[in-house]
Regions:
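Catalytic strand-loop-helix junctions within cyclic-nucleotide turnover domains
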Residues: 1-12, 37-41, 68-73, 85-89, ...
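Cyclic-dinucleotide signaling modules
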Residues: 1-46, 50
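Catalytic core of bacterial c-di-GMP phosphodiesterases, primarily the EAL and HD-GYP domains
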Residues: 12, 31, 41, 71-80, ...
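Conserved long alpha-helical elements within nucleotide-processing catalytic cores of c-di-GMP signaling
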Residues: 17, 21, 95-99, 108
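Active-site catalytic microenvironments for nucleophilic, acid-base chemistry
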Residues: 22, 84, 100, 117, ...
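Active-site core of bacterial EAL-family cyclic-dinucleotide phosphodiesterase domains
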Residues: 33, 44-100, 137-139
Length: 170
């Protein structure tokens, strides 16, 4: 509304468009009022979308490992790989970029990055006595498994990196 959301017609229409887009994302028969928080979320999503392809190409993602501990023995049985994206001095967490990657059809490429990083890690651990035999679990989307060449790509990774394939949990 004038003047709260702008003094120029183009500025007001741009903000109305942002609100309309968000209402459409929520489903049919919805409405959304524009506010500055909405604008910040949209700008952040646009920023992430713009940087995501570059992050995939340059392999800017990192894996962090969360231990899975056997309650009875207190021993670490395996690790869960958690993807993180360091960007300009801050961490972009999966809940911020995974939905955008899925929406833009990039989730398969991210899964490939995670698989390769996990395989590389397991290969490096293969020679370390205290880490040998420790498995890594990764979360993958059902969409990834249904892609025709998923298993071929997985087989190529397993043949390239030398480790016991049973140590990779999908």
């Amino acid at each position: 509304s004038y003047p709260a959301h702008g003094k120029e017609v183009s500025e007001i229409l741009g903000k109305a468009d942002i609100a309309m887009y968000q209402a459409k994302k929520q489903g049919k028969n919805q409405y959304k009022l524009f506010d500055s928080a909405l604008e910040q979320r949209v700008q952040k999503a646009i920023y992430i979308e713009g940087k995501l392809q570059q992050a995939i190409t340059l392999k800017q993602f990192e894996l962090y490992f969360q231990p899975k501990i056997n309650i009875r023995s207190g021993q670490v049985e395996s690790l869960e790989a958690l993807i993180r994206w360091p960007n300009n001095g801050r961490m972009i967490f999966p809940d911020e970029f995974i939905p955008i990657a899925e929406d833009k059809g990039l989730i398969g490429k991210i899964t490939e990055c995670v698989l390769e990083m996990a395989c590389d890690t397991l290969s490096q651990w293969n020679g370390l006595v205290h880490l040998k035999g420790l498995s890594i679990a990764i979360n993958i989307s059902g969409k990834d498994i249904s892609v025709d060449n998923f298993y071929e790509k997985l087989e190529r990774l397993l043949s390239r990196y030398k480790f016991n394939p049973s140590l990779l949990e999908l």
